[in-house]
Amino acid sequence: MKKALITGASSGIGFEYAKYLNQNGWSLDLVSHNEKRSRIARESFHGDNNNYYHLDLSKKDNVAELLGSVDCPDLLVANAGITIMNRAGESSSFQRDKLYYLLCGGVIDLIEGLIPRLKEKDTSRI
């Protein structure tokens, strides 16, 4: 059975991608920071081989925790994302740093952390 790791899996594109793969027999490692939406996603997918991770990937420690918890996927969908709902020029340095890590640094850390395993498998895709 093929395995997909999907970040941002509790809504939007990530949720729809997870739904499509689940319907086509894939097992899923689903990551979301929103507990309520994670619960809804958990109830939406069938299969005993699915895993759910309630993690905020804007935090470096949580990316490391995820890397230590998942097996090598056949497919990585690095989809997690948020936006800042402030007017231009009103976001704090903390908000920008968190957003930057989630959308850029964390994605790089996740991919770099998986690369050795992905190379060994030779059939994995990002």
Q: Where would I find each of the regions flagged by the language model?
A:
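Conserved glycine-rich cofactor-binding loop
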Residues: 10-11
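Substrate-binding pocket helix/loop in short-chain dehydrogenase/reductase
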Residues: 87-100
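Conserved NAD(P)H cofactor-binding loop of Rossmann-fold oxidoreductase domains
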Residues: 80-85
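Active-site loop of short-chain dehydrogenase/reductase
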Residues: 2, 73, 118-126
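Conserved glycine-rich Rossmann-like NAD(P)H-binding loop of the short-chain dehydrogenase/reductase
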Residues: 24-40
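A short, exposed helix-loop element centered on a Lys and neighboring polar residues
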Residues: 111-112
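Rossmann-fold cofactor-recognition segment
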Residues: 45-59
